Every structure is written in structure tokens, then in C-alpha cells.
Amino acid sequence: MKQRLQDSIDLKMKYQTRSYNQLAFVNCLQGKCEEAIQNLSTAETILRENHEDEFDKRIIITYGNYAWVYYHKGQLTKAQSYLDKLERICQQFPDASRYTAMIPEVYGEKGWSLLNSGVQQYKEAMECFETALEQDPSNTDWIVGYAIVLSRLEQLSGVTESVDSSHSVKQWRRVLKLDPNDAEAMVQLALKLRVFEQYEEADTLVKQALEKSPGVPYVLRYAAKFYRCAGNIEKALKLLDKALKMSPNSAFLHHQKGACYQNKIKTLKKTRGSIDSGKIDKLINDCKDCFTKAFELKPSFIIAKLNYAHVCSINGEYREAEKIYNELLELENTCPENKQDIRFEVGLFEQNYKHSKSNAIKYLLEGFKIKYDSKSRNNCRTHLEKIAENPQQDIVAFCIRGIIHMLDGEECFEKILEIERGKIVTCSR
């Protein structure tokens, strides 16, 4: 996270104040309070120079962070001085508390902070953006944040919608209606449209985005992802190399480059006839190097580790793959989606490479039993159902179906209880 924030600052991307505030928070957590104070001082200077007319609204977060950092430094008088500044500002807003005014600017910034804090915070981030937009519906900054979090939640759910029912598509179109030159919104919308097979419009949007912002890393990386998903691997690699020159320490970019090599490996493996073993070996090494770099830069990058293990499996390095899978299975402090991803990939490894049907079922069931709606959970279910499609109708198939039906029944019962609790709360008001 710290590297990503530093990249956004070094590349002079929009909303640097936000990056400095979040960097201050990270530095304070790491005990680097002096660096945190310097980050906040820079954020304050940017606001004074660029937003003089809205300074009081926009400075609330920064002053709150000042108070928090000085409190952690043990400088209580200094912390109180910033609380006093907040109190004077909050007096301007009728519904404000003593030190906090819950105005759109505060809700919006809180939404961005939560969005950058990980998957567990996405739903609360969505609610913050919704609240901000209720009061300021034309603020493209909040709409972009709202569109991003909706896109991620839709992707996590694994539920295939239609282009007309996708809430994130509506929000990305809303951004472009207010700001037709927003290249970042163009590539994000293009990625969503490609999912719904709107290929022509998606391709046009990516080309327009690259014409408008050919040197913006954010545009380059998502355009590269678009071309990789479209099968144009060479185009994707070219864009990723360009982006890496500007952001050499981006775990995301290294991972995307590894994913491109992984696609090339799969294509070559499927090719009939003689295969250049030297070419395959080089691709595998390049692929592993990219994934290694990604999780070295971001140790919590579970997908990069899973991808690395999968490449080891393809290359016959089963012991290395198994070692990584076992390490990942022992992780406790990770989000439910990561736990599902791990168990799904381990299940496939057991089924396809170790040829252990019983172990595959064990891990796929573990993934499915984690009650968190996600694409990986759906994948676990789909593979279990395929295993259960046994023409001999053996006891294993019946057990799998029984467990799936039992879990479905539990979830239906829990939803009924939630609805009934909601009725009771409504009646008691």
C-alpha cells in the first residue's frame, strides 16, 4: 500500500492530498511519526494552494490526522491545538458534532480510505460514497470511487449480470457524461463492457483512453489488462513495460506481466506438434520471476503466490507447488475470499496433478463451506457438482450433493431469520 501511495505522489496523479493523508496514516502505524507530520504538512500546503475557496471543508480530514499523530507522539498540547482548529471549522456546519462535520467531503474521503484498506471494507466504502453523492450528486471524484467499489463487489460476487443491470456500468457512464475526457473511466468501463461481450464499444474506449492519456500508468495498466483478456498478449506486454518504467515497484504491474506469460505458456502447451522446449523454459522462468517480484513487493498478494504455484505445477515442480499451497493453507489472518481462492486452487492441484479425488473434494468442500459470496466459492461448488456427476451414482456423489443442499438450506434459513428480524425492528419503531 505504501509503495502504491508513493507512486501516485511521484507521478503527480490527481488527488495527491488523499495520498499524503493515507501515507501519513501508514507512516504513523510504522512508528515514523515525523514522516507522517511531513506528509500532512504537504497535504495542507496543496489544499491551501489549490482549494482556497473550499479549504475548511477539505482540511477536516487532515487536521483530524494531525491530532491523531500528535496524540500517538505523546504531544497532547499539539494534538489539542488541532482539535481546537477542528472545533472552529465545525461551528460553520449546523449538524456537525464538536470535532467532526459529516459533510460530503468527509464521507467521500472516508470512502476512499476504506476502498484502499482491503476487501473487508468495500461494503462500508460503498455506503460512504452513496451518502456523499446524496448531498453532492455531480462530484466525479465520489462517483469514480463508487464505480470502483461497485465493480469490485460485482467481480467478487461471481454473479453474471447483464450490461443493463450492472450498477458499476451505470456509474462509469455517469462519470463520462460529466467528464467525457476521463481516460481512467474509459478503460474501467471498457473492462466491464468486455465481460458483457460489448467488444466493439469496449475496444473503442480503450483506444480513445490511450490517445488521451498515453503516459498515465493507471490507464496503461488497465488497458494492458483489457488486451490480455482479449488475447492480444504482445500489446498488453508492450503497455506493461511502458508502465513499469514509470512505476518499477508496482506489484500489480509485475503480476499482470506474469499473467501474460502464463497465457503464452498455456497457448504453447495446447499447440499440436513439436514445441520449442527452450522457448517454454524461458517463458516459465520469466513468468515465475514476475510473480515472485509481485509478492516480494506485496507479501499479502495471495493470488500472485497461487499463480506462481500453478506455474510450478505446469512445469512438473510438484514439491515446490505443494510447499506453497501448504504455507497458504496455514494462513489465518486473511480475508474469506483469499481462503476460498487457496482451497479452490489446492483442490484443482489435488485433482489434476496428484490425481487424488478424495483430497480434491476435501479442499473444494472447505472452500465452499466458507460462507462468503464470491467467484471462488461458486467455482468450488461447480467443480464439486461436476465430481458428483458420477454415472455410477456412488456414495461420494450422494454425500457431495447432500452437503451442498444442506449448506444451501442453512443459508436460506439464515436469510429468513434476517428478514424476520428486520420486520421486528420495523414494527418496534
Model-predicted segments: where are they?
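Canonical positions in the second alpha-helix
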Residues: 8, 43, 86, 132, ...
